[in-house]
Amino acid sequence: MANIALLFMLAAAQDPAVRAREVAAKLPFAYRAYLEVRREAGAIGDPALRAAVEAQVLAPWLPPQAWAYGHPTEARKLLGDPKLELPPPRKGDFLAAPGGACEDGHHGYPGGLSVHTLATLRQARALAESYRQVYGVEVHTDQLTAAVIWQGTLTAATLPFRADGSCGPEAEIAGAPAHHVLGLAAGILRHLPDDLLYVIAAAPSPDPNRICPWLSAASVIAEGRTMTCPQRQTVEAFIHHFADSDAPLTTLSWSRYVARAPKGWARYDALIQDGNDLLLFSRSP
């Protein structure tokens, strides 16, 4: 029996998902960010919305009842995407997830999703306060918090770590990174209101001509039908987009770190010692 237990322990140690979670827990700035995101989700005032967001953080994948899981051929036809592949159901870990592809994305390390989410949330709050003070606009705080936390959750499913410590590249759906559309599909299945779905969808672009195709694709994946796109543009949607626009900096800082650091898991061990990639970037000539 002892040998069997040892084999299970060795297998767990070699599981990339387990290893990524362990790395994220050892990165102080990433683990602090994860705990703060969890606290922010738990502080959402609306009980139903709070429950939905907390559930999504704990289970950051496309719910298995999604229509496209049972009808992949039909989904590919409706989306005009013969290469559509969905991530395995019930696979993903918010704490372990990167914020982007490991080689050429932003926050491409275990725990990167938490760091990216918290930074975006802080930036969104600052913008909301600026608009309140300057323009007298009252922003729907719960909606903005929920949108920011929700938007990247499916990265946990679309960018799994491999045995060699790599992840990515990420596929696209309807011209957006797969996690974006799949996160909207998860929101539909978790019964988020349409106006909140619109705010989530606005992260990459506030342009309705881009948002509506993303929502339509998400609706096909979730329910096998296209949804009517909300027409009302909101301040919250624009704030979400502006807050989630630091990729030029964070992608550059991570790419510089990748160029200097070892490959694979050794890179993340180095990151534990170095602090974080943006900190080193700020010290560079």
Regions found by a protein language model. Give the residues of each.
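Residue-level marker of positions within ordered structural domains that often coincide
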Residues: 6, 125, 188
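Divalent metal-dependent catalytic cores for phosphoryl transfer on phosphate-bearing substrates
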Residues: 104, 109, 115, 132-260, ...
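Hydrophobic alpha-helical targeting segments used for export or membrane insertion
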Residues: 4-13
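Acidic/His-rich, divalent-metal-binding segments that scaffold phosphate/diphosphate chemistry
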Residues: 15-168
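Non-catalytic terminal regions of proteins
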Residues: 255-285
